């Protein structure tokens, strides 16, 4: 069996967090934020990568130090996410870690569940009041993108871009 061809030096554009689109190279910055719009964890991926594939890595990078001695806190009280994360593996991961979540159900999966009738199971719990707090992540992204270097990404390498986004996140923490 022939091995697929890879660019010399490994990685290629995919390893650098750059993805192809009609407009050229694009990047996604996946992050989690606390209730005060402060970033807790950052992950850089190519622009065409699906959001749900980075759900677990983003949550596993959360580390909030406790005041005084002790291990840092790694588990959030609850997670509010959009429909991109409304799939079985994401919900199962949250259930296994004991994290409450508010994720709306996609209309096509809702229709499939209803089509199955009683075998389709119960709909996932959804709290509209808690879901309204999901805009904190959008506001955190907007705060990060107030920094020109984060908004435009002129950096070619993933680690350089992450090194640009991390101090921007740090300034958000220091200002609030």
Language-model segments: what does each one mean?
Residues 2-4, 41-44, 52-55, 89-92, ...:
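A short secondary-structure junction signal
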Residues 43-69:
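Active-site beta-loop-alpha junctions of metal-dependent nucleic acid enzymes
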Residues 48, 67-154:
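Helix-centered, glycine/charged polyanion-binding patches within enzymatic domains
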Residues 164-176:
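Charge-patterned, long linear interaction tracts outside catalytic cores
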